[in-house]
Each structure stands twice: as structure tokens, then as C-alpha cells.
């Protein structure tokens, strides 16, 4: 079969026009085209057909050095990447090329990054809790195995640290494979994560096949085409792990889903599409749906996905984060007000929610304690205006007691993280679900009313708070 060869006619930023004149056959939409710039392979993805003989493409790499007249080859397929166990312990880019300097990824299977979502009949609906060891999450917005979890927050409130702690707590204890897709985030964080995984043994450099994680990066400095597709590349690897063996559980981390939307918006503008609300692409809901519908559990195995979602200007009604809400089973909202109090993780206990917080799934005791905790915190929130204007002395005795308990609960929701040990010097804590429930049950019932607030700050279990109180009294 003869190759379909075209020539570049125009390069504008990440958009490249290619003219095919030989046999009049235009490459299909989403086909990958290849050209070589100083021996470096550059992949272009067909986005539009213009006239009878020209296609408009989005480049997956820098277009610097591309010139008019350069030959372009139609591969006849969409972007395809290596999948399977050979990807474990490796870092690749959006088109499946290794970027860790460890040589070629020799996989027997290559797969297209575009796939249909599993049929309804093949999807699984079982619900189990995924214990994270983070008190505020496990108690108030528990995660479901095989569910979709969103971490919402503005700039600098701790989304990436929370994702790193989840990788530390869940991926290490988890028997299956993990895939991490770095979408448009800081290269430094990607590098730190890689070296942390090597140090903790999640990545085995000597025998990569014994590693537990595959990494796919399309960082902030990449062109929009790469950032718009790298989440699909990561998901393709996660799907291959899920479907490889029966009963295989896969963890899929994405940092950051907003950058996927942002890159889609850039691509849309470059292609000259009319923007929709707040300047986003008109296909925002479709793009998000195509990605999210593929992240699902089937009868073969499950994909549990944790997605960091940046909230522009802390506005949860922005179209990008609000489009994601509909697809999620649990939302963990990080709040700047709580971060300003010095409480980390800065999870908002009233804004965060989960479909799994149901007495039929978590049990009556867990559900009852969680709702009591939220009730105390909600009462405290409603009293804050009165306290600000009139002071604590004007409150009734009952309200004073509620405020005292709420402040202790607020501090007890903080927790030292393993991944932050380097910065804080405080040893990280993993708290079992039963200990979490017992601790908060004692707090709302007033068993610890005599202990000072400071005893509850940055501890693991309630026993540690009691010990800390004894030290504070000395």
C-alpha cells in the first residue's frame, strides 16, 4: 500500500495546514500525521478538512523549525501508544514516546487513544468504600471503589499535596496498578513525584516490571494539542490494565482536569470556533463527557479515578469545574478560608459530599456521626456573624458549648501528611476508619469537652489528642 504523503502549506503557532495532492485522498479526522524536523518526529492530529485537498492539524509538539514544503506522512490511524505491563515504571508523553531517558518501551500491544465507553450492560454498579486514611475524607465524603472523585480548589490550597498523599496511602497499599496523568501542571511537581515514587518503591528502576505505576506527562510548557490529549493517553493505559485480567483494580490519577478543558479551549480558539460562555470551547460538555464516560468499572475490573480540578478565581460556578460535577461520585472541595486558619488538608466539611455516604453502604453508625459533625459545624457557621458583632459572651450556654465542640472538631479534621513531612517536620499519620468514627463520636457526645482546642490540632487518632493534652497541661 502506497503511503499518503502531503506537504505543509502553513504554520501558525500550534496549527499546521497540510496539502495532499497525489491521489486526492484526505486523511480522516483525528488521524495522526507524522513529519520529521531535524530527525525529531512530530505528530500532527487532523482537526478539520479545508476544501478538497487540505487538512488543518493540531501539533502534539513544538512547531519551531517546521517549514512550508516539508513532507508529511498519513499514518492511517489515530494517535496510538504502547499499553500493558511494559509501561510500568516508565514516563511517556502524549504520543507514547518515553521521556525518562530509559530507552524504548517495548510493548507487544499498541492502542488508539480514542475508544468508545463500555456498554451499559458491561458496567458494574457495586459500591464499596475505599479507605484513604485521611480523616475528613473517610468520615464526611468517603470515596467509592471504582468511583470518580474530584478534588476542587483554587490556586495554592493543596490539591497536588492531597493527590500525592492519596497516591502514598492508597496506591502503596493497593494491590493493583496505578496510572498517573500529569495534564498541564508544573514540571517540577512531576519530577518530584517520580523521584518520590522511586524512593518509596512504587517504581522499581532495577526491574521496571515490578513497578506499580505508569506515568504519562503533558506539562505546562507543552503545546495545547499535547495537553488536550494526554488525559486520553493515560486513560488508554488504565483501560488496558483494567481489561487485562479479571478482577483487576486500577487507580487513575489526573492532575489537573481543568488544564484538559483549558487546552481544549486553546485548540478551539486556534481552529477559529466561536467560543461559548466565559470563552470556553462550544464542545466543552461533549469533550468532558467523552473522557469521563470511559473512566468506569466493568465486570472485568474497576478504575477508581481521582481528579484534581482547579477552580478559576475560587468560583465553583465557572463552566469548567461545574461541567465536571455531574460526572463525579464524590467531591472534595478545598477551601481557602480553611487553609487561612492553618487547617490542612483544607477540605471544606460542609461543601464536600459523596454518594457513598449512605447508611445502606457505610452503616448507621458512620452515617450518624458524619451528620452530627456536619450539624455542629453548620450551627457554628451560622453563629459566626453574631460572634463577630457581639462576641462569645452574648451566646447562650448551649451555643457556647456547640462553638467549643465545633472548634475542636475543626482542628481534629486536620492531619499531618506523609508527603509533607519534609516541609513540616511532623510525622505523617494514616488513621483507620474505625478510629476516625470513634474519635468524632466522642467529640460530638462531649467526652472531650475538658481538653484544650490545641490538643486536637495536627494529630492522628483521638488517643494522640488526649496524650497531647497531657503534655500541654504540664
From Swiss-Prot:
Instruction: State the EC number(s).
Output: 7.1.2.2
The record's listing under InterPro entries reads: AAA+_ATPase, ATP-synt_VA_C, ATP_synth_F1_bsu, ATPase_a/bsu_AS, ATPase_alpha/beta_chains, ATPase_F1/V1/A1_a/bsu_N, ATPase_F1/V1/A1_a/bsu_N_sf, ATPase_F1/V1/A1_a/bsu_nucl-bd
| UniProt xrefs under HAMAP family | ATP_synth_beta_bact
What membrane topology does the annotation report for this chain?
A: Peripheral membrane protein
- Which PANTHER family does this entry report, sorted A to Z? ATP SYNTHASE (PTHR15184), ATP SYNTHASE SUBUNIT BETA, MITOCHONDRIAL (PTHR15184:SF71)
Look up and give the organism this protein is from.
Rickettsia prowazekii (strain Madrid E)
Quote the cellular component terms of the Gene Ontology held in the record.
plasma membrane; proton-transporting ATP synthase complex
Name the gene for this chain. Answer: atpD
Write down what this protein is called.
ATP synthase subunit beta
- NCBIfam families cross-referenced by the UniProt entry: atpD
Which amino acid positions bind ATP, per UniProt? 153-160
Q: What reaction does this enzyme carry out catalytically?
A: ATP + H2O + 4 H(+)(in) = ADP + phosphate + 5 H(+)(out)
Please give the chief subcellular localization of this protein. Answer: membrane
Task performed by this protein: Produces ATP from ADP in the presence of a proton gradient across the membrane. The catalytic sites are hosted primarily by the beta subunits.
